[in-house]
């Protein structure tokens, strides 16, 4: 793949910020959108904007075909066995909350355990905290190695017959750690537990086969994978979803409504109450077409090369601390000695370089790292080695500036 040519397909990247060419290194927060996705959204709103499912008119049929067609694209993209297993949500957060509120509250009780890790995004911690309080279950944390990885031996020791749910991110949004979720799922199932995978940072960057991974649930967002904001996906095994109750009620998800009772539609629609995110789903479908045309294997390889190049370039700079393992996904999180991450990001932004600074919705991990915040550069298919060179130059400038200040 040619990242320089791919970059030309993303209009927002063709601009100057503060007098310098934009270098966008914040795709772990949200990705930019290619022309193909922008045009798909524009086409929907210009040509066949309508509500879905019940309309017999032409626009309604076109909108329904686009919406349900996107569901099939997603099924194929993650290798689910049926579109009944693909639930549209507002994002990863909503998807995890759905599982916690529906499956969790129905299947957890006093003495049961939920196993997660200290590296989780808040969206995969807080829902389990809440359901644990409501049910009397206990949150148990897998220990991390010094480099922020999980040791399978520790998984074997931690998961027990008390464990009912294991919920782990596939890829850390801070460390870039790629967790062995397939092996963890096998251990969870051996003890009768189910496995949820937070795929927000993996689905955009690598091939996903939920059946190969063996997970019971898999959640991800459209906006991190070249799609629109406000659209996400929950994959769930049909056997689980059929037993789960909806957590949002209203139009679209009902089969029959009486004065005192109601019944629900079949899967997947019983979990999609209200007017659905039609444009978002169509845009996500276009994003999947775009990514598949390039090839997820090629994207993963490209990002791996960028991550290793970034590690090499940052290792040349004195006073830098880089967090996470050597083998990682396409991001680097770091601090400069005696310089606050927000100051780092501000100086970089003055030269048109966009990075993220803060706790990255991972405060327990920041405590584990013994820092309050970090700076993060994250890469996607449109980034190049020249972008990383610009980052390294900007970090050197930052060091020099604050060296003079202090």
UniProtKB/Swiss-Prot annotation:
GO MF terms held by the record: cysteine desulfurase activity; pyridoxal phosphate binding
Active site positions, chain numbering: 361 (cysteine persulfide intermediate)
One protein family per Pfam: Aminotran_5
UniProt KW keywords: Pyridoxal phosphate, Transferase
Gene Ontology terms: biological process: cysteine metabolic process
Modified residues (N6-(pyridoxal phosphate)lysine): 224
Cofactor(s) in the UniProt record: pyridoxal 5'-phosphate
Name of the top EC class for this enzyme: transferase
Task performed by this protein: Catalyzes the removal of elemental sulfur and selenium atoms from L-cysteine, L-cystine, L-selenocysteine, and L-selenocystine to produce L-alanine.
Family: Belongs to the class-V pyridoxal-phosphate-dependent aminotransferase family. Csd subfamily.
Name of the protein in its database record: Probable cysteine desulfurase
Gene: csd
